[in-house]
A protein has these predicted regions:
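C-terminal cap/substrate-recognition subdomain and adjoining C-terminal extension
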Residues: 1, 75, 82-211
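Active-site neighborhood of HAD-like aspartate-dependent phosphohydrolases
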Residues: 1-52
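Conserved active-site and cofactor/substrate-binding residues in soluble primary-metabolism enzymes
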Residues: 16, 68, 155
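Active-site phosphate-binding/coordination module
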Residues: 17-24, 70, 133, 143, ...
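Metal-dependent phosphoesterase signature
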Residues: 54-92
Length: 212
C-alpha cells in the first residue's frame, strides 16, 4: 500500500495552525495579546527564512498550556478547529486526499506543529494517522515542554523512519506534498515529491508542482 504523506500548514490549510492557535489563545485570555503576537511573528519570520530553532518556538508557544489538562485543551481545540481552521481547508486538498484514499493509499499527515492540533485537524480531514510534535504530560497536566524528536526538517525524516519500521511500511512509491523549504530533507526521500504553494526557496528546486 503506497503512502501519501502530507505537510499540514500552508499545504492542506491556508495558514499555519500554530499561528492561528496563538491568536485563538489571545481570544481566550490565556496570553497578553500584543506581546505574544509580536514575539510569534518574529519567530515565524525566522521559520520562513529557514533559521528557526524549533525548540525556541515550541517553548514559547506551549507556555500558555502549561498546567492545563489535556481535556481542557481538547475542548478548546475542538472549537478552534470548527470555527477557525475548517474555513481555511483548501477544497483542492480535500479532493487530493480523496483521490489518494480511493487509490488505496495510506494517508499520513506529518507536521511540525503540536500533536494536539494536528490530530484534531487530521480528524476533520478524515486522516487518522499523524506524526507531529509530542507534548509532555506529568500528573495529568501538560508541562509546556515537548517530548522526543521534533517533526521538523531532518526530524521529520527520523520520526518517519521510526514509524515505517514500527508499521512495516516503506517509502516505495510514496508521495509527499509540502510548501516549505524546511521539508526538503523529506521531499528528497520520496519517489513522488510535490510542492504546493511553494515558498521562494522551493521554487528553484526541480520538484513537481501540485495543486492541492
Amino acid at each position: 500500500m503506497p503512502l501519501a504523506l502530507f505537510d499540514l500548514d500552508d499545504t492542506l490549510i491556508d495558514g499555519d495552525c500554530a499561528t492561528l492557535w496563538g491568536r485563538y489563545m489571545t481570544e481566550l485570555g490565556w496570553v497578553e495579546k500584543t506581546a505574544f503576537l509580536h514575539q510569534e511573528r518574529r519567530l515565524m519570520e525566522l521559520y520562513a527564512e529557514g533559521r528557526l530553532a524549533m525548540e525556541d518556538y515550541m517553548d514559547f508557544s506551549l507556555a500558555p498550556i502549561a498546567g492545563r489538562t489535556p481535556a481542557e485543551i481538547a475542548g478548546a481545540v475542538e472549537d478552534f478547529v470548527a470555527r477557525i481552521v475548517a474555513p481555511r481547508i483548501h477544497a483542492d486538498a480535500v479532493r487530493c486526499l480523496e483521490r489518494h484514499r480511493q487509490a488505496g493509499d495510506r494517508l499520513l499527515i506529518i507536521s511540525a506543529s503540536a500533536h494536539f492540533l494536528v490530530s484534531a485537524i487530521g480528524r476533520r480531514l478524515g486522516v487518522d494517522e499523524v506524526l507531529a510534535i509530542d507534548i509532555e504530560e506529568r500528573d495529568g497536566l501538560y508541562t509546556g515542554r515537548t517530548r522526543g524528536t521534533l517533526t521538523y526538517r531532518e526530524g521529520k525524516v527520523r520520526r518517519l523512519d521510526a514509524w515505517l519500521a514500527q508499521e512495516g511500511e516503506t517509502l516505495a512509491g510514496a508521495t509527499f506534498y509540502s510548501d516549505s523549504r524546511n521539508d526538503l530533507p523529506l521531499l528528497s526521500r520520496v519517489d513522488r515529491p510535490h510542492t504546493v504553494n511553494p515558498d521562494p526557496a522551493l521554487l528553484g528546486h526541480e520538484i513537481g508542482r501540485a495543486h492541492v
